[in-house]
């Protein structure tokens, strides 16, 4: 596996193919242990992990904290409502305080983009060894979700061999509110790194044309691997047209809490055009996998019949895969420069 090169995990834009494979190799090991009934391993015994969530979260926070506990780490949680923030303390001071308490890793989620990055810079300037793991920041990035989505797709297409290269030239359809989705941005970095051809499907107000060049400034180390080049990003305005040749579909939540007014004529109109229903899915004859990062707005972006009845709906797989994926990230950060 080699040395892990990142002190912080803030985005997937600087991940090399080898970084992805290191994460997935560990994810496979941890998943096997979990499936064998192992509740805890002592990999991070003596480490202190602090989750600092300035934005509401159930799935991500619980998944990270369970991942840390399965690695035998000590876990503490920060609650903004009962913290010194209400007394005027800054976000940076809060992070520095937890670092001074001996936190080895800060798991940070915030509604504004780049807050984890700014905290990591301040920590580095004070020469602390504390790492930052971005659990979602504004519209910018959600690296752990991007990784677990990629892992889930690879497991579907290559369940025994676990070959990420199997995604090369696959057509992955991402449907919905890309504009407000940090998950979509992380998915774009991850999928195109392995040569997948991504089709973004939605109205112009939620998928501007500039998304076609989202990953054009690829870091050089992305291409030093057996895959010759990145995949592509194209845009479709018709779900019926784009689903016909898709190899997989990732449905995104319509993020009404982040949305400016007047981006959609109506929720009803959006659902008529972009809600994934059995009728629309029947236009594809390949029994393709369906993913959704959750939480789900049933009947708005995806039909209940697909969630509850379609055999290749992998939403629960995503949730269960999140724990070993996040175990892998915590473990790798704990080994940085050690």
UniProtKB/Swiss-Prot annotation:
N-terminal signal peptide: none
Pathway the protein acts in: Pyrimidine metabolism; UMP biosynthesis via de novo pathway; (S)-dihydroorotate from bicarbonate: step 2/3
The organism of origin for this protein: Prochlorococcus marinus (strain MIT 9515)
Binding site for L-aspartate: 87, 182, 253
One example of a Gene Ontology biological process annotation: 'de novo' pyrimidine nucleobase biosynthetic process
Name assigned to this protein: Aspartate carbamoyltransferase catalytic subunit
Record-level Gene Ontology MF annotations: amino acid binding; aspartate carbamoyltransferase activity
Family per similarity comment: Belongs to the aspartate/ornithine carbamoyltransferase superfamily. ATCase family.
EC number of this enzyme: 2.1.3.2
Pfam families xref list: OTCace (PF00185), OTCace_N (PF02729)
